[in-house]
Amino acid sequence: MSHQRILLLLMAAFFAWVSAQTPPGQADKSKLIAHDVLMKTTSLSETTIATSSKRFLRLYDAEVRDTVRGDNDVDREERGTTPLLSKVDDLIHKVFKSNPEQAQIKAWMKSRVHPQAIFDTLRLAKSTTKLNDDPNLLLWLKLVAAFRAKNGNQAFSDLDLYYLLLKRSSGEELKILIESFRKTGALKELGKSMQKSLSGSWVSKTLQHETDPKIVYDTLRLQEAGTKLVDSPIFHQWLAYAQQYRAQKGNHWFGDDDMLDLFRKTMPEKDVVTLLHLLRNVPGMKDHGDTMQRFLFLSSKTSRKMMHDVWLNYDVTPEQVFKILRLVKVNMDAVDTNAMFIHWLRYVNLYRSHTKKNVLSSVQMVHFLADTKPLRSEWQFATFFESLKDVPDLKRLAENMQTYLFQNWLHTEWDPKAVSSMLAIPFPTSAVYLPKNDPIYKTWVAYTLYYTERKGGVSLLNKVKTLLDNDNPIGALTAAMKAQ
């Protein structure tokens, strides 16, 4: 028998002995909780359970109601009396004289120690042993079954047990464990109750009363699932309920913005970012997950780096991120109004560095943008790339993409005069007449210098530069047109 079991037995048996020895006048004092030993399970406060929530809870029979309640009316106290070492040996001897397992259960049942306190004492949440190979866990589950049989299922509800076990296992492992309960005599009723509670039978009944998804979320205590929320069948049932609620009431009653707000209020932002990405893999939730990612991106600057980290962790390609952010609909007229596009370009650089792959090279990037934004001309792209040069960490990328366009223009014999007109479309003017700080003018200057260097040599290039520096773009254009 493990040291932990002996410790548990010692505690439980001693508490039972102290209970029997407590004088009548001290009966009330014996009920005081030793806060340094016990950790109470979370229950819903009266302010959380509104009228709709109470109606929601009344929908179910005795077993299913157990799924959505967090009440715990059982005294979870331990006695704080100091142990008398002279009695310890006698207690241990009496307990082990009979069946050790039954003796532990019997002694524990007399102690009024709550199952969660025993769970914490055995450190079951930190155990690395597989669920079905952990004798301490199996013994503890039998204690839970006995505790519920004596005090009622609400004394330690299915949700209490589910979220406690979820701390140490995945949702799939927990599902297998619960199925195995029904093959173990002492756990058969516990397994039946939990399977019924996790079956999702509550969805259709609750929908009839049009209970707000926020109330259902709180009542199901989904925030207790933490980072394992997506693994929980209860969460998937809630998502299905939210979808049906929207279909019945209209999206404006519980839209994606409301769902995002609920997540942000009940979990850390990092967990929200991860959850939104994982929702893309839930049937029927891909578009909603993407929409909430965009909402979060626009409303929280602190979340953007977290989103980059999550995408990298799950190997989300730049092309996929482009779709998630719906950049195909984003205007590309000015850098200062394109926060999402700027961050996407930064993600491209991050992805390259993270994967060590030359994904979306400068040439590929230009073609990708041309394909995804067919209504944008290469002249507009060149101007946008020019404005990107003002973003320090994107300057090199912008120069490379712009240079690729310049190479094509030079190859097709576009001279500076023709380019000056094309860049200004749809305005009835020419780039040379625009202010010097205008991206269109700056793009024309960049191409004129590129053209002159390759067509006219260093001497002519220096002459054109001097004319431009002296605010004489017309003279610079005239000189550049002499290049052969």
Curated annotation (Swiss-Prot):
- InterPro entries referenced in this protein's UniProt entry, alphabetically: PexRD54_WY, RXLR_WY
Motif RxLR-dEER mapped to chain: 55-79
What is the induction note for this entry?
Expression is induced during host plant infection.
Q: Which Pfam families match?
A: PexRD54_WY, RXLR_WY
Q: Name one GO cellular component term.
A: membrane
Annotated disulfide bonds: none
Task: Give start-end of the signal peptide.
Answer: 1-20
Cellular location of this protein? Secreted; Host cell membrane
What superkingdom heads the lineage?
Answer: Eukaryota
Q: Print the keywords alphabetically.
A: Host cell membrane, Host membrane, Membrane, Secreted, Signal, Virulence
Which family does the record assign? Answer: Belongs to the RxLR effector family.
The UniProt function text for this chain reads: Effector that enhances P.infestans colonization of Nicotiana benthamiana leaves.
**Per the entry's comment, what about the domains?**
The RxLR-dEER motif acts to carry the protein into the host cell cytoplasm through binding to cell surface phosphatidylinositol-3-phosphate.
By what name is this protein known?
Answer: RxLR effector protein PexRD18
Q: Which organism is it from?
A: Phytophthora infestans (strain T30-4) (Potato late blight agent)
